[in-house]
């Protein structure tokens, strides 16, 4: 086995080394730039795809619409049958689906909840 490897090594040493610089010729500068931009865009697309699938947040439950009499209220899944009295305190008198933007004063900062 060692004699065979010595023969192969000798043949490889006798063959002249290949020169990588003697190709068909260098590409034009505009072609190099075009290839560089295309490779960059492919890498960015791969990064966006990985980010989209890897960093996906869990989706929130969709709203259900429950009709009570003449009015439809949006209810989150799992809160059926529970009434929130928070909305009653700032519901508008002008329209049933509008809310008042009540102001709260915190020290010198004037803020509104919406």
Swiss-Prot record:
Residues 52-114 are cytoplasmic. It comes from the Eukaryota. Keywords: Cell membrane, Membrane, Phosphoprotein, Transmembrane, Transmembrane helix. One of its GO terms (cellular component) is apical plasma membrane. Residues 105-114 have a biased composition (Basic and acidic residues). The chain crosses the membrane at residues 29-51. It is a single-pass membrane protein. Coiled coil: none annotated. InterPro entries: PDZK1IP1/SMIM24. Its main location: membrane. It is found in: Apical cell membrane. Residues 1-28 are extracellular. Residues 92-114 are annotated as: Disordered. The keyword Phosphoprotein applies. The keyword Phosphoprotein applies. The modification Phosphoserine is found at residue 85. Forms a heterodimer (via N-terminal transmembrane helix) with SLC5A2/SGLT2 (via TM13); this interaction enhances SLC5A2 transporter activity. Interacts with PDZK1. Belongs to the PDZK1-interacting protein 1/SMIM24 family. Auxiliary protein of electrogenic Na(+)-coupled sugar symporter SLC5A2/SGLT2 and SLC5A1/SGLT1. Essential for the transporter activity of SLC5A2/SGLT2 but not SLC5A1/SGLT1. This is PDZK1-interacting protein 1. It comes from Sus scrofa.
